[in-house]
């Protein structure tokens, strides 16, 4: 027996050695190929590889549409993003291969954040499943669908730790805990990239936003970040490092300052820490237009900002075209070196090589896959299953849930039949008309056993302009408020139980969606109070991309189920509402009692004067005059 174990050990050791040698030989082959290619490239062609414009199909910033076809022919781009549709992508790739001197293939990127056509729960919701396998499955299916439609690079995962729910992009991350965030970061990378990115279903992952973006002061997007190195290492950097350890192929720098220097041009962050300390050797890309935006920081105009970004370790310039248009002159002036340009170009080419684009430039251009692999029944079933794992039951007085499929159930609220808003933020690649509404899901599940009554009940906000800002690219039709409320109360009067579908609409969380008031929007609060006043039992289905302040709701509503934004939301909520599935979510982010408590998180360091009694004010203790220190719902909570 000992001999068998020894033999197995020797064989295993030889296998590992063989794999190591094979990987090393593969690296040498890549190095030879790229060195040979770069030996043929002009400076203009090298600078072109560093340029990443937006195609303008999908808007993620101020519209900055490049003339892509012209730029491809002129060898002025290394890739592009925000173009959806395999045939458009094939046409651009064909120009790059057939109509340029060296035929270098293009990277094609997209924000595939929580699904492509099949949409899964938003990342914050996914984290509440505490299920790394579920996250990996989501990323794997997203990669399959994106790659089938021509995409080879996703700007995901976002792993920014956030403890302040005023910040809208908390919806894109995994909550407040760095350990859980690290586990989920690795799961995302495994799901997107697979083992080696050589398969047709595997795409390049990009961890973002490096670094500390989730700690933006006052929860305001793009704002300043300032903290000690001790806090950085202990509380914020771990998920980025975990993604690097998992082999993530690219990293996106963040908009914010780190140590008073924009992350885009922060050499300590991008080179000393990321590359030298952590050993990252992949592609480093900026965020949208961030090199140009260094002028707004008061740091430098575009030309000097481009120099600083390159010197700091940036490889690819997203949208600003600073590298393309200014680095040649800066090279002549001695402000950058050819070695720095070559290093950046090499890493862009290495990413393409690792994706297999040099051996098969049309690897992601199989038009037959689109018909077979997007929004499939199997993918939707997985999304529906995972969604129920993310729902968090916050309250269930008298065991009101699950509901019986009998009698009359009133479904009331502006989120009940809002098809455009079911998928949540960062779902621009999907086709909203394909996704079912909550009303459709509940009626389907109830069948002929219960009558489902419906009324919209209210607008999102009383203020039309405020609602317009929150609705973003998914506007909701507004109605007469008195008529909406009257219809809702009439509907409620006929019902045995009321299900209120309320909360944020999809674009009220995500990028550029900071809030100072974190309650359910006012028009919906008024509706909810009127529904509770009827005396009928009320279930609140809470749609949100962030923790909200729910003191009144917790005190007055019978049951509260936080459903986030779940993709296959309608069917998944119906599964839980009628007891087919038990909600499995536990909070990964703290729900405050007041905005004044923020930032609020479970693992805060002790003070020298801890509060001995969190329920009443204690002078000379670390507490508030007017509010308990305790959150409404703590990290890890869920019934």
Spans of model-derived segments:
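Glycoside hydrolase catalytic-domain context in secreted enzymes
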Residues: 19-639
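Bacterial Sec-dependent N-terminal signal peptides
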Residues: 1-26
